[in-house]
Amino acid sequence: MELPIYYCKTWFRMKKFAIEPMDESLAHSRHLSGESYTALIGSDSAPSCFVEFSIDKGMVGVGFLDKKCREYLTYQFQVTDSDNLFLTMATHREFEGDGDEVIGGESYIFNEEGGLVIRREKFNPHEVEEARSSFEPSRNYEKLPKFGCYSNLTKADR
């Protein structure tokens, strides 16, 4: 079953609401012209995830939200050409209990040549671990989606 999609200028992460909601026709126009917009998946007030299109800046971001609308997982895609995206970073956050305070997380930073940096960070006390590795980059490519067809970008398990 396809989830409903709502559109806005951006999702305000700190206050957990949509800024400047827009109708589908305006969002479609912005998609075609490469202007920024955000697609909210599942709900306009408590989406399961959102997709931020900033093609004019060469990026697409995906934020996955838990039941408390906290962004626990983020994907950052870079536009590689007119049809393709490359996943350059995935960040997983851990929260303090039911609150919004981030207590730690892991970031995976990928490059198109197969290089990988894994960064684990805790905030109290502050600790950072970093490791380097390699990976098969072909799995990080995605087609730039057509308007309204975001399911390839919103796969939480990559």
Which sequence ranges carry the predicted segments?
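Beta-turn initiation residues at beta-strand->coil junctions
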Residues: 51-56, 63, 73-81, 106-109, ...
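Exposed regions on extracellular, virion, or secretory-pathway luminal proteins
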Residues: 69-70, 81-84, 98-99
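A short glycine-rich beta-turn/N-cap micro-motif
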Residues: 44-49, 68-73, 101-104, 113-117
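Short, well-structured hydrophobic secondary-structure segments
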Residues: 35-67
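Long terminal segments
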Residues: 1-34, 89-158
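Generic detector of short, locally flexible boundary/turn motifs and exposed helical patches
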Residues: 3, 14-18, 39-42, 82-84
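Short, surface-exposed coil-to-beta transition loops
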Residues: 36, 58-62, 73-74, 85-90, ...
